[in-house]
Amino acid sequence: MYIHERDNWTNFRWDASEVSILQEVVCRKQGLLYGRLSTLGFDSKLRAMAENLTHDVVYSSEIEGISLNEEQVRSSIARKLGIENVKYTAPSHYVDSVVGVMLEAVQNYDQPLSKEKLCAWQTAFFPTGFSEACEIEIGQYRTHEEHIVSGIFGREKIHYIAPSPDLLESEMQRFIAWFDGEDTVGSVIRSAIAHFWFVSIHPFEDGNGRLARILSDMLLARGEKSELRFYNISSQINKDKKHYYDILERMQRGDGEITEWLVWYMKKMIDALDEAETIVTTILNKSFFWQKAASVPMTERQTQMLNLFLDGYEAKITSKTWASLAKCSKDTAIRDIQDLVSKNILVEDIPGAKRPTYSIVFDSEDITQFFTDVCITQENGIPYLTALFKGHRTVCERMLALDAERYQKGELPLSNMLNKYCSYLMARDQKKAKLFEEEF
């Protein structure tokens, strides 16, 4: 028996004690993230949002086996948000349509949901009326039975049979009424329920998964009362697709007890918020760097290369890497680098090394004096820089794996590592270093 075949099937139940613990963690991390974002100017916030939405659109499509050009998505979002100085890659009409759906949903999060809106969004996903070379119904609820299957033709495995077409109008009316109704459980739980509820109805022939994730984002935006989105769950689901589909299948064969789904969903939310912290740290450090370096004369090539590394490109800064990325000769790369060293923009990691590597100078003074108990830890295979800042503040910053490896091998000095990952903590006035952020 499938869940929708039960009476009152949407009276979902869960273990409140287990779920509330994770809900508190999510809410705390949301608060920390938005506290950090409050230190950014509006332009920097838009850039952070654009990067997040780029990942959301790309990975939400990738979950369904659809590959989008990331640069096209980024360009489309930047243009629609009015962000300048972004490398432009002309997006396809399809990419523009998909991006338009996401932006409409989050920018109008406080507007009521409707059948017409959902149908228009689904149409945008399939402008030609085809999905994987098969003609599908678009702009309307499906008119045929829907079986979720896998395997080769003739030996398919049925994972789920959705409600029959004659039930879709009433099922969706009930869903939309709940979606626009009073929030009695908190936006995090509501977003998880909306996701599960919508994909279980499966109202369209295709596009249901992407719409479910968009609706989840909408409810999170409502809960935060903000159209600015800085984290997304799609990238985390994409990393764990097998568990995603396995849990959905178990819950859809269950009796409405959805604790397992809520726990999994909120753990992915926590991962998404941690990833967003990394993006924000990168933007904070980059902003701090350019405040200091704004008056330093540089060529366009030097500026582009610095921005590439400031945005987290994972590679050592060497003349060979510089020449390859900048598409210039090695001699030109050496001149570029030496010029920036002379201007205190780059510093040699190990002075006199046979094959020198360089780090970007965020703060000209050694900030190691402000940090104690510095170490590198691992969590789920991801390296983190942990330290105590000014004797009372615990810092935990996600690192590039290459930097963690180089530090442990003695190739990256502690001062340069702290400079790269913790500069946002320090601002400078005309006389002394001071705290850039007191509280997040």
Labelled PLM ranges:
Residues 384, 398-401, 424, 430:
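Short, intrinsically disordered, low-complexity terminal segments
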Residues 340, 387, 403-406, 424:
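Hydrophobic side-chain positions on well-ordered alpha-helices
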